[in-house]
């Protein structure tokens, strides 16, 4: 039997959201370049509906794990990354999806820029999740050309699902399980400390957002929006010192705007 040459590994952490996970996996498994893809789903809870969805969509060469331990995407992503066989690592939230032909277009991108981190466009879908099935409201495309700049050391700029990372580059990086939020940003900065991603003009992920009370996104929770967010920012700043005086001044201004006065030389 011929050994598969896996180009892409996509890691999908999930937590008891089988309906949304089904949408994500359907978009992944319908890719025209799907033969070059390994799908790794990591659930942090025992859930029969999640089992059924993974049994339906995943193939013999894919991986589905129900892990123990503290719930949360960081440990799930770290576990998935440690098992990945692809030359490139992608991350997808269980409530998001991929556009058709994304992988085919991404394959052309990596041929132009081999062994380099890449980022790409996305669309943002507004929906409500008050019923058993999410209800579509609107969708708009985000062109991310020139969006990623050194100002990312002040605030995050690009969604995690808009990147393809060479496995060799991120092998020794991990998501910080101690963070309440912004662990994606912290991980990205660890990449930028090594190299800055290259933009390629293709439409990648569909990022689904819920603006009403039916939202269950962790980033919309109280822990991610109150002063805990400031402490997580300080934590990220400590782990990734400002690369120049301009960035340190911008960090200082941001913290001052929420009532924290800190010497810029500490940022």
Enumerate the predicted regions with their spans.
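Conserved nucleotide-sugar donor-binding catalytic segment
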Residues: 143-227
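Short aromatic/hydrophobic "clamp" motif used to bind/position activated sugar donors
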Residues: 89
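Flexible acidic/His/Gly-enriched loops in nucleotide-sugar-dependent glycosyltransferase catalytic domains
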Residues: 75, 104-169, 217-220, 237-249
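N-proximal low-complexity "stem/linker" segments adjacent to membrane-targeting elements
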Residues: 1-27
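Glycine-rich, basic loop-to-helix element that forms the pyrophosphate-binding segment
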Residues: 68-84
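Acidic donor-binding segment of Leloir-type glycosyltransferases
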Residues: 25-67
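The conserved acidic donor/metal-binding loop of glycosyltransferases
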Residues: 93-97
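Short alpha-helix within the catalytic core of nucleotide-sugar-dependent glycosyltransferases
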Residues: 25-26, 86, 99-111
């Amino acid at each position: 039997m011929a050994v598969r040459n896996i180009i892409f590994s996509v890691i999908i952490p999930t937590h008891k959201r089988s309906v949304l996970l089904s949408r994500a996996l359907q978009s992944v498994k319908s890719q025209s370049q799907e033969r070059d893809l390994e799908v790794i789903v990591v659930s942090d809870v025992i859930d029969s509906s999640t089992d059924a969805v993974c049994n339906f969509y995943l193939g013999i060469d894919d991986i589905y794990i129900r892990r123990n331990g503290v719930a949360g995407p960081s440990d799930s992503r770290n576990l998935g990354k440690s098992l990945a066989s692809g030359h490139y690592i992608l991350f997808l939230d269980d409530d998001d999806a991929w556009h058709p032909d994304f992988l085919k277009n991404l394959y052309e991108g990596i041929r132009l820029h081999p062994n380099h981190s890449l980022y790409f466009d996305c669309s943002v879908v507004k929906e409500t999740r008050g019923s058993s099935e999410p209800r579509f409201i609107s969708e708009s495309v985000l062109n991310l050309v020139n969006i990623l700049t050194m100002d990312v050391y002040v605030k995050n700029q690009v969604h995690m699902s808009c990147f393809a990372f060479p496995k060799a580059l991120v092998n020794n990086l991990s998501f910080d399980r101690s963070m309440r939020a912004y662990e994606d940003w912290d991980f990205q900065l660890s990449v930028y400390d090594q190299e800055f991603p290259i933009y390629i003009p293709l439409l990648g992920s569909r990022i689904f957002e819920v603006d009403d009370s039916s939202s269950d996104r962790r980033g919309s929770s109280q822990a991610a929006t109150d002063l805990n967010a400031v402490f997580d920012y300080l934590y990220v700043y400590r782990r990734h010192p400002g690369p120049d005086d301009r960035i340190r001044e911008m960090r200082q201004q941001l913290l001052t705007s929420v009532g924290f006065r800190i010497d810029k030389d500490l940022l």
